[in-house]
């Protein structure tokens, strides 16, 4: 599905993930779905001629003396999925599609053990801090130290990085990062651990004070195990 970049604006990419090539029936015909949506005229879609999963594009925004600065965080799996293009070409395609010269691509290393290679379980945009810098919530504990360190360094160059603090880290604790946010509420996946589920909710309440009393948790462990949360 297209990924929402901001209110009323969606990015539409080529959805043809390598991990579904043996089960093509699960590859959504994005154009057909959009065509059947009666509300489609209310939104703007940007076509990007790149093979990218929506879960591998996390959008962030900051402020400086010249106005807004925009960021897209992706893992380097995008480079592998578009191997005929150079990194600079991929970056140019994305920047030109948005017509936003102040758009920065932040690349994270791709852990090959993660077949999805998505960033939406690694980093979550929280907002803009008092210094105008984007603030992000991250979960790096599931990665080997060298990969986690490289991810942290790449993110900290641009963002205020807040780490998800839990008493223990489950193989599914990345799901806490992959929450759903609307203008009215935030829904956080629960993974069936009463302690860490509560800790995740508490940290969201600290990071999103405007959403206090509107942050909810839905238990999804079995669903996430079966479907990766997608």
Regions found by a protein language model. Give the residues of each.
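The feature marks the mature, well-folded catalytic cores of soluble enzymes
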Residues: 1-230
